[in-house]
Amino acid sequence: MSTVPTDHGVAALGEFVFECGQSVPDLEVAYETHGEFDGDNVVLVCHALTGSQNVARSPAPERNEGTRGAGQAGQARAWWDDIVGPGKAIDTTKYYVVCANVPGSCYGTTGPASERPADLDLPEEPDHDRWGTAFPPVQVEDWARSQRRLLDHLGVGRLRAVVGGSVGGMNVLEWAKRYPDDVDRVVAIATAGRLDAQCLALDAVARRAIRADPNWNGGNYYGEGRPSPDEGLALARQIGHIMYLSKASMERKFGRRSAGRDSLTREEGDLGLPPEPTAAFFPYREVESYLDYQAEGFSERFDANSYLYLTRAMDEYDLSAGHGTDADALAAFEGEALLMSFTADWHFTVEQSSSLAAAFRDRDVPVAHHVIDSDHGHDAFLVEPEHVGPPLRDFLVEGVGGRAVSDDGGGGGNDSARPERDHAPVHASLFKG
């Protein structure tokens, strides 16, 4: 397979005033590009909550390595490599792909873990050199504005498309709302115009897990010899992973299988938790082992304060803000839209994407809502390239008339308009026991 030019860097964009009214004197945005710019072939990819600018693999091996706060690992490293690349759905031999780490994150863009200017006047001076919780509150709107600033810096005007999944899909919707004249097509995958109450509740518990960790120390855990709140961050991530999987996929992957009775007598993973008092009698199950494994890896690569900031940005996003309805918010957009949803995703449901499709249709925007029958849950947009790729590829080339693009016909909440489910759309059981 042929290689394509890739580039990466950190752009210093000058003073940036956030939607909250607070500012940083020089916003730095870490970015990556793939392909060659020909003037009208730019596809902006918006990463999900804990993703990074490293959307696809680079021909340079050192670009595919990294550790917390500087490089990428796990989902953050080449997190959509099955979709972005030569000959793939977002074909980097045709498109100039740009992906930028969002403000508030920790992969090179300015965020809580970044060094703050020494001459910065703060009401309470932290005893370390990082922004910490003095960093301004971040919103999805700030992500879109920082991306527009970065594209201006790169000499890019109008975009062929903006593509993203999960909260990255919210980022996409904000582009259609805020910069309707700057983009031809938008692709919002597994997303919604706002979170529902159940997701808000789970995110709140995740943030409390971090804040309850004594090592969080009010967000002031930076500096030599200070332990990070890894236990709290790990628990927060475990809550997230439960949200990302469907009931059916968890049963298929793990069931009630034991990972070994002896495992629970040790401290659980490296999370610092004491063993359960009943550990000698009951099994340590595979689903617990999976959650511990995911949590340990995540704590090594992500910043706890960034998790607080980014989940709050996701929670607070409302597409209709400043407008009466979602349709009003999208009224100025004159391009085409593709929405993709997954039948077993209870984090961002099929119904929520149907509602967005209705909002686009209300403003006569050509739109398709492509529903994928999958039991993978919210993670499907990352792990099912064979289903995500074809409609995405054809939409970028042909719009809503693309051969692999289907539409639910505006079925909305009518189950007869899409494949039958084998799961409950809401995990009420997560609030029990």
Swiss-Prot record:
One of its GO terms (biological process) is methionine biosynthetic process. GO terms for molecular function: homoserine O-acetyltransferase activity. It is found in: Cytoplasm. Pfam families: Abhydrolase_1. Its EC number is 2.3.1.31. InterPro entries: AB_hydrolase_1 (IPR000073), AB_hydrolase_fold (IPR029058), HAT_MetX-like (IPR008220). Substrate binds at R237, D379. Belongs to the AB hydrolase superfamily. MetX family. Homodimer. NCBIfam families: homoserO_Ac_trn (TIGR01392), PRK00175.1 (NF001209). Transfers an acetyl group from acetyl-CoA to L-homoserine, forming acetyl-L-homoserine. This is Homoserine O-acetyltransferase. The gene is metXA.
